[in-house]
């Protein structure tokens, strides 16, 4: 049965005992409202590690002034049940006051990796992500940490953080988990109307179009962006916020494509902003 831990002190006590015995720890940091994408990461960790820890913590530092921290869905009982069914050992669910007992004396600032895509639209968001992931890594001390490729910019930033701060953890990127029709699984999908849900499937279809263009030899980003945008505009009635091509994991905007690339989409529906992406090309 999955154990619920609610304090930093108790979590650290358990981790220290596990480390002394040579136990491997797999870690999945989340903000809760779990779905199959999260559970895929939990299953991967359970199959690899002696102990799997899932954090459920809605981090206030990654919410901007126009983003409602209080409205973010919280369902700890359901989340606990879900991860228990797939074999997680511990859910770490600390209070905000325990994670941030006072004003932080040191600000962590992400560099150019946060100046594009989601980071450009949500200033300070990735500073908050890196701060909380640093704290969680120090508390949980995982051997392996699992992040979804759906948030590919976040994955690239966390990998850079691990390198820059010498964290003794290996980051495992997990492929996007999709519905049967291709829509990327997301906690935000529940906010879609019936018509929006039907239209949302075209995000993934437009990425398959981009992949086909690349495989046919197209290397001009503008051509791919224009074709994908045209497809989305003909199939989605909502606002298309972004179609972009960047190198990966460097996140440098590409004009003439060389090497590995990251094609990113963002569409604003009435009550949900959905993102999707595909990473293609040689590393």
From Swiss-Prot:
Catalyzed reactions per annotation: (R)-pantoate + beta-alanine + ATP = (R)-pantothenate + AMP + diphosphate + H(+)
Residues binding (R)-pantoate: 62, 154
Domain of life: Bacteria
Gene Ontology biological process terms from the UniProt entry: pantothenate biosynthetic process
Protein residues bound to ATP: 31-38, 148-151, 177, 185-188
Pathway(s) of this molecule: Cofactor biosynthesis; (R)-pantothenate biosynthesis; (R)-pantothenate from (R)-pantoate and beta-alanine: step 1/1
UniProt cross-references to InterPro entries, sorted A to Z: Pantoate_ligase, Pantoate_ligase_C, Rossmann-like_a/b/a_fold
EC class name: ligase
Gene Ontology CC terms: cytosol
Entry protein name: Pantothenate synthetase
């Amino acid at each position: 049965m999955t154990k619920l831990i609610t304090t930093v002190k108790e979590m650290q006590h358990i981790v220290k005992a596990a480390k002394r015995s040579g136990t491997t720890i797999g870690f999945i940091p989340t903000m809760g409202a779990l779905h199959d994408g999260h559970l895929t990461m939990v299953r991967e960790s359970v199959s690899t590690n002696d102990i799997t820890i899932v954090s459920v913590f809605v981090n206030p530092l990654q919410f901007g002034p126009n983003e409602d921290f209080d409205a973010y869905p919280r369902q700890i009982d359901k989340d606990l049940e879900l991860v228990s069914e797939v074999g997680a050992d511990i859910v770490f669910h600390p209070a905000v006051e325990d994670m941030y007992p006072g004003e932080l004396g040191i600000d962590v600032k992400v560099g150019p990796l946060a100046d594009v895509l989601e980071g450009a639209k949500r200033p300070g968001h990735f500073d908050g992500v890196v701060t909380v992931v640093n704290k969680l890594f120090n508390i949980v001390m995982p051997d392996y940490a699992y992040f979804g490729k759906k948030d590919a910019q976040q994955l690239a930033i966390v990998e850079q953080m691990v390198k820059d701060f010498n964290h003794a953890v290996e980051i495992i990127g997990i492929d996007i988990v999709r519905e049967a029709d291709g829509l990327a699984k997301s906690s935000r999908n529940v906010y879609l109307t019936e018509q929006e849900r039907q239209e949302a499937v075209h995000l993934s279809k437009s990425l398959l179009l981009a992949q086909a263009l690349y495989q046919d030899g197209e290397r001009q980003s503008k051509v791919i962006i224009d074709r994908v945008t045209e497809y989305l505009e003909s199939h989605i009635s909502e606002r298309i916020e972004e179609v972009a091509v960047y190198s990966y994991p460097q996140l440098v905007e590409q004009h003439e494509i060389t090497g590995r690339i990251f094609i990113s989409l963002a569409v604003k529906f009435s009550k949900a902003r959905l993102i999707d992406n595909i990473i293609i090309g040689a590393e």
